[in-house]
């Protein structure tokens, strides 16, 4: 019965197991297709790869399985700085900046301005900016997807994939180092080295490129030294 198949499908822990379930026969594939999406941990791309850069292994944290992956020639990359559901990764090396799919080899078209982040700050000289991390506001194939890049010494840079005539907007060189950035429910957040959490409001300039229009410092509950020691003792 279809109801029983749906129950069994939801009991499968790993994404690999669900793929194998759907491959058994037509009725099982139909049951998997009709079932609501099951939350899953992301697959981990293991390093090192072979010298050619075309072979890799994926690790499934849910069941510990290691799956071999042959990368399409177009997807050969050396430095992954971000990812999105469906096998999409952002690569900063070799130049230029690219967004490719590890499974299909498809690539998101970017113009020359979007392929390189440049900063004109007088504090450390102009030139290409080193990217530490890139986060996506939505699917990279969407025309509304905004990219936020955490850079080495130029703060946050923003780019809209669906804007063919615009590039990256570098949002200043902060005095306090940024540790991490994240899109959550369409909002961009950053965590500073000193523990402060910031939420950014993003608008569009006259060219349609994304820019930060407001900054909100959020109130967070800090863990004191005494509480931190207790937590470390419990771990």
Regions found by a protein language model. Name each.
Residues 73-235:
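A sequence/structural signal of beta-propeller blade repeats
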Residues 58-75:
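A short helix->beta-strand "capping" segment at the edge of beta-propeller domains
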């Amino acid at each position: 019965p279809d109801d029983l198949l749906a129950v069994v499908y939801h009991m499968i822990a790993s994404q690999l197991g669900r793929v194998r379930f759907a491959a058994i026969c037509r009725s099982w594939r139909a049951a998997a297709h009709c079932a609501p999406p099951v939350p899953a941990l992301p697959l981990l791309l293991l390093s090192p790869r072979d010298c050619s850069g075309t072979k890799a292994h994926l690790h499934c944290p849910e069941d510990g399985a290691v799956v071999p992956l042959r990368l399409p020639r177009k997807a050969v990359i050396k430095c992954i700085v971000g990812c999105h559901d469906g096998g999409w990764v952002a690569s900063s090396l070799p130049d230029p900046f690219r967004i490719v799919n590890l499974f299909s080899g498809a690539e998101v078209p970017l113009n020359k301005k979007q392929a390189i982040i440049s900063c004109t700050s007088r504090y450390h000289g102009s030139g290409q900016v080193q990217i530490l991390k890139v986060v996506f506001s939505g699917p990279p194939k969407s025309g509304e997807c905004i990219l936020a890049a955490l850079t080495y010494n130029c703060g946050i840079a923003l780019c809209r994939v669906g804007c063919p005539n615009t590039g990256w907007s570098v949002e200043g060189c902060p005095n306090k180092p940024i540790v991490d950035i994240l899109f959550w429910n369409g909002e961009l957040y950053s965590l500073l080295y000193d523990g402060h959490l910031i939420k950014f409001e993003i608008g569009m300039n006259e060219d349609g490129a994304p820019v930060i229009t407001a900054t909100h410092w959020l109130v967070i509950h800090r863990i004191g030294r005494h509480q931190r020691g207790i937590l470390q003792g419990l771990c």
